[in-house]
Swiss-Prot record:
It catalyses: alpha-D-glucosamine 1-phosphate = D-glucosamine 6-phosphate. Mg(2+) binds at residues 102, 241, 243, 245. This is Phosphoglucosamine mutase. NCBIfam families: glmM (TIGR01455), PRK10887.1 (NF008139). One of its GO terms (cellular component) is cytosol. InterPro entries: A-D-PHexomutase_a/b/a-I, A-D-PHexomutase_a/b/a-I/II/III, A-D-PHexomutase_a/b/a-II, A-D-PHexomutase_a/b/a-III, A-D-PHexomutase_C, A-D-PHexomutase_C_sf, A-D-PHexomutase_CS, Alpha-D-phosphohexomutase_SF. The keyword Repeat does not apply. GO terms for biological process: carbohydrate metabolic process; peptidoglycan biosynthetic process; UDP-N-acetylglucosamine biosynthetic process. Its EC number is 5.4.2.10. It comes from Shewanella halifaxensis (strain HAW-EB4).
Length: 445
């Protein structure tokens, strides 16, 4: 199949005003997408965005392009990425468009598409859109132009959808929860969801100004929520990223619960209820501790390449339901078509209530192994992944680690860097082994 030139594995993304992220290209992209999508039955598209100041710019450009191609546009304003996927289905739109750069700083932005069923757009459709980009922009006749409307009740619809994943017979009454919205798209959603389910909510990262998304808050910057959980004597914390598709949690002692441990909680809960279908999909970066803990429960575990798109591919291939990344992308296909941080948090809270257990108790039997990642630059045409010196160092370390350790070597896709990841039982040894392999890479001539 022809390779995509414009779309990456998760749409397009970059610095605003440079490369692909310009208003000119957004206008043309809206038109090209409209041309392709108009070949199907439903002539309407939903657009949502996060809280970056540039969201207004790209929203206007996309809606103009789509209208010029004859498609109606429904604007839902700042909304989490999974909300766009859900609302695309419920409004029976032909596609959903998200304007977001997820966990990146405010000066980046991105554009990605959902199909009418709320899943990522097929590669074939993205290739069709790319083909239209090469053509001159032409406008449909005036009477065929698309209409643009704003949907005022989108937030309320999504709040009710999220609450629907929590058992009706349960309540969060008595729980004090810190919710970090990363000054992002969940700022007006997540606190309301958990409050309406009965919890006492302390919200942080809930005052976006267009420039502070993901700035020292959210799932990629856990310091503030850990401090707040301890200072407020809260039962737990839930941290989301800028577009709401990732989650990290914090227990009452201020310890971070990452995506691997969340996957473990959900898999164990599903197994106990007799609803676990198959096993769990992680990634190459998933901690070996998750693998070993699931083995102890006879739950199959497989690894995909890094990226929620690849996790989804393996889930579909195996016909399994639960998968995700240690970074907090959690997929549960019984509860949605894409990663949803709020829903994943609700499912963990439901497991706590069902089992009358704390986060500490639910994670007591999974021991995360020390993991060290070293980025090392290599020069010239030497490929460290085929170097006998590097491979010998890797084999030596693997022999020393045995079954209780793992070595992963990955090249960066954008610069001459090798990522050396080593995990095992002892922090000191793991650190030494990672630098031993990194030195072998540096010694390549």
């Amino acid at each position: 199949m022809k390779q995509r030139q414009f779309f990456g594995t998760d749409g397009i993304r970059g610095k605003v005003g440079a490369g692909k992220m310009t208003p000119e290209l957004a206008l043309k992209l809206g038109w090209a997408a409209g041309r392709v999508l108009s070949r199907s039955g439903t002539q309407k598209v939903i657009i949502g965005k996060d809280t970056r100041i540039s969201g207004y710019l790209f929203e206007s450009a996309l809606e103009a392009g789509l209208s010029a191609a004859g498609l109606d546009v429904m604007l839902i304003g700042p909304m989490p990425t999974p909300a766009v996927a859900y609302l695309t289905r419920t409004f029976r739109a032909e596609a959903g468009i998200v304007i977001s750069a997820s966990h990146n700083p405010y000066y980046d932005n991105g554009i990605k598409f959902f199909a009418n069923d709320g899943s990522k757009l097929d590669d074939e459709v993205e290739l069709e859109i790319e083909a239209e980009l090469d053509k001159p922009l032409t406008c449909v006749e005036s009477h065929e132009l698309g209409k643009v409307v704003r949907i005022d009740d989108a937030a309320g619809r999504y709040i009710e959808y999220c609450k629907g994943h929590f058992p009706a017979e349960q309540t969060l009454s008595g729980l004090k929860i810190v919710v970090d919205c990363a000054h992002g798209a969940t700022y007006h959603i997540a606190p309301s969801v958990f409050k309406e389910l009965g919890a006492e909510v302390i919200a942080i990262g809930d005052k976006p100004n267009g420039l502070n998304i993901n700035d020292k808050v959210g799932a990629t910057s856990m310091g503030q929520i850990c401090e707040t959980v301890l200072a407020e004597n809260a039962d737990l914390g839930i941290a989301l990223d800028g577009d709401g598709d990732r989650i990290m949690m914090v227990n009452r002692h201020g310890r971070v619960i990452d995506g691997d441990e969340i996957l473990y909680i959900l898999a164990c809960d599903a197994q106990k209820r007799g609803v676990l279908r198959g096993g769990v999909v992680g990634t190459l970066m998933s901690n070996l501790g998750l693998d070993l803990a699931l083995q102890a429960l006879d739950i199959p575990f497989v690894r995909s390449k890094v990226g929620d798109r690849y996790v989804m591919e393996l889930l579909k291939e195996h016909d399994w339901r639960i998968g995700g990344e240690n970074s907090g992308h959690i997929l549960n296909l019984d509860h949605g078509t894409t990663g949803d941080g709020i829903v994943a948090g609700i499912l963990v809270l439901a497991a706590m209530q069902r089992q009358n257990a704390t986060l500490e108790e639910l994670t007591a039997d999974i021991k995360m192994l020390p993991q060290v990642l070293v980025n090392v630059r290599f020069e010239g045409d030497n490929d460290p992944l085929v170097s006998e010196i590097v491979l010998a160092a890797k084999a030596e370390v693997e022999q020393k680690l045995g079954a209780r350790g793992r070595v992963l070597l990955r090249k960066s896709g954008t610069e001459p860097l090798l990522r050396v990841m080593v995990e095992g039982d002892e922090q000191e040894a793991v650190t030494e082994y990672a630098h031993y392999i990194a030195d072998a890479v540096r010694n390549l001539v």
